[in-house]
Swiss-Prot record:
It is found in: Cytoplasm. It catalyses: tRNA(Cys) + L-cysteine + ATP = L-cysteinyl-tRNA(Cys) + AMP + diphosphate. This is Cysteine--tRNA ligase. Its cofactor is Zn(2+). Its EC number is 6.1.1.16. Its main location: cytoplasm. It is an enzyme of class 6 (ligase). Binds 1 zinc ion per subunit. CDD domains: CysRS_core. The gene is cysS.
């Protein structure tokens, strides 16, 4: 199948041609672990998980390397640690914050149905030169200084943006427009106001590593340059993240990596997902519409109920990844209704058997058009109506195997229901026993006993549906009352 991706750098949709089809390489910026991930953070996690699945489908499971980092050294982490654990030494407090937050992040993304990336490096593991020879931050900074792209000033090491003629190409911001940019700190010791920190000195209490420039810690941008190079090399296929990372983070990553390695590019395709707002407004703690993934999963703060992770995932995928998304209760309720109906169709089948629907594959290959793919899944679900026998079975299997490409319908109906805190589960063996008794009662025309068993099941929260199977024989199916 053909895969075309929109490249932020060239501002066009291009055919995807990997550097090495036997090892397709993708890097996506991960969390800074100072606070639980909010629902906006979930979008790139889900979007690039779908791309990871698609690349594995095209090139093979063992031929895709997906790296998503964890930033565990940052001034925001220091501030949170000092606030939350004022009685502890800062380094110990930082360890508590980062471990708890990283653990919660992993639980959140698992609940969203995301596959684990191939590698999840932590920034603190790549500050100093490593025994395995993988790229590290100190060595990259040395290379930048040696090549004339960085300098020491005011106790810091800074990147000289004027040393890179096409700095700003990704974001479209010309250097002369950035001299008084709102997001750029202007310091007297900088050669140019847009120069950014590669290394900063640490106080006695702050996290720090011994380096040629004194005890200090890395700047944010150099971390991703080191970790991507460590696992993917100097140039790789895809770099992803949210629109908010284009400038300054991704712009500065490109500058550091290209100048340190002497390459003309860092990644061949730059992909960015759109912004998320909540009920028509920008998400903000001050507006009271700021929600973490964990809050949506485990509390009733949004919409008066707890939401299964798969519902959150589908709600994200119904909008194209480059379009803005309005996160609403109505959208989640609709997504839940859709999943409920799809799981009613696939039931407790455990395997995704057969070929992925051609149209679903084509939509995903067209710049990851999950919105169109979801619409096509609706059509597949509807196509089983009026069919019987093998045709009905084929439609059901096509729905499941195609939805799995999006990370949906990857479990049995019962397993799905178990993820919904609002659903009361019952003993399926007991239900099967009672259904057998009811069938026997109906066969001997003991309708009073049949109705009694039906009422007993209803009291357990079980709804019966009497009908016929694919061969036209009487059949009773059941589901949990919703």
């Amino acid at each position: 199948m053909e895969l075309r991706l929109y490249d932020t750098l060239t501002k066009e949709k291009r055919a995807f041609i990997p550097i090495d089809p036997s090892n397709v390489r993708m890097y996506v910026c991960g969390p800074t672990v100072y606070d639980f991930a909010h629902i906006g953070n979930a979008r790139p996690v889900i979007v690039f998980d779908v791309l990871f699945r698609l690349l594995q489908h095209i090139y093979g499971t063992d031929h895709v390397t997906y790296v998503r980092n964890i930033t565990d050294v940052d001034d925001k982490i220091n501030d949170r640690a000092a606030r939350d654990f004022p009685g502890l030494p800062l380094n110990e407090a930082i360890r508590k914050v980062t471990e708890k937050t990283a653990e919660q992040f992993q639980a959140d993304v698992a609940a969203l149905g995301c596959l684990p990336p191939t590698h999840q490096p932590r920034a603190t593991e790549f500050v100093l030169p490593r025994d395995d020879g993988r790229a590290d931050m100190v060595t990259l900074i040395k290379q930048l200084i040696a090549r004339g792209h960085a300098y020491e000033a005011g106790g810091e090491v800074l990147f000289d943006v004027q040393s890179m003629p096409d700095y700003g190409a990704l974001s479209g911001r010309r250097l002369e427009e950035q001299k008084a940019g709102a997001r750029v700190a202007v310091d007297a010791h900088k050669r140019n106001p847009a120069d950014f920190v590669l290394w900063k000195l640490s106080s006695e209490n702050e996290p720090g590593w011994d380096s040629p420039w004194g005890r200090g810690r890395p700047g944010w941008h150099i971390e991703c340059s080191a970790m991507s190079a460590a696992y993917l090399g100097d140039v790789f296929d895809i770099h992803g993240g949210g629109l908010d990372l284009i400038f300054p983070h991704h712009e500065n990553e490109i500058a550091q990596s290209r100048c340190a390695h002497g390459t003309h590019t860092m990644a061949n395709y730059w992909m960015h997902n759109g912004f998320l707002q909540v009920e028509g407004e920008k998400m903000s703690k001050s507006l009271g519409n700021f929600f973490t993934i964990n809050e949506l999963l485990t509390t009733e703060k949004f919409g008066g109920r707890k939401w299964p992770g798969e519902v959150l995932r589908l709600a994200m995928l119904k909008t194209h990844y480059r379009s803005p998304i309005d996160w609403t209760v109505d959208a989640l309720e609709e997504s839940k209704r859709i999943l409920d109906s799809w799981y009613d169709i696939v039931g407790d089948d455990t395997e995704a058997i057969g070929e992925v629907d051609r149209e679903v594959s084509a939509f995903l290959g067209d710049d990851l058009n999950t919105s169109a793919a979801v619409t096509r899944l609706h059509a597949i679900a509807a196509s089983r109506i009026g069919k019987s026998g093998q045709l009905q079975i084929d439609a059901k299997r096509k729905l499941k195997v195609s939805a799995v490409m999006l990370g949906l319908l990857g479990r049995t109906k019962r397993e799905y229901l178990e993820t919904d805190p609002q659903v009361i589960l019952v003993d399926s063996n007991l239900v099967a026993h009672l259904l057998s008794d009811r069938a026997a009662a109906r066969a001997r025309k003991d309708f009073k006993e049949s109705d009694r068993i039906r009422d007993e099941l209803a009291a357990m929260g079980v709804v019966l549906k009497d009908g016929k199977d694919a061969d036209g024989k009487p059949e009773t199916t059941w589901e949990i009352a919703r």
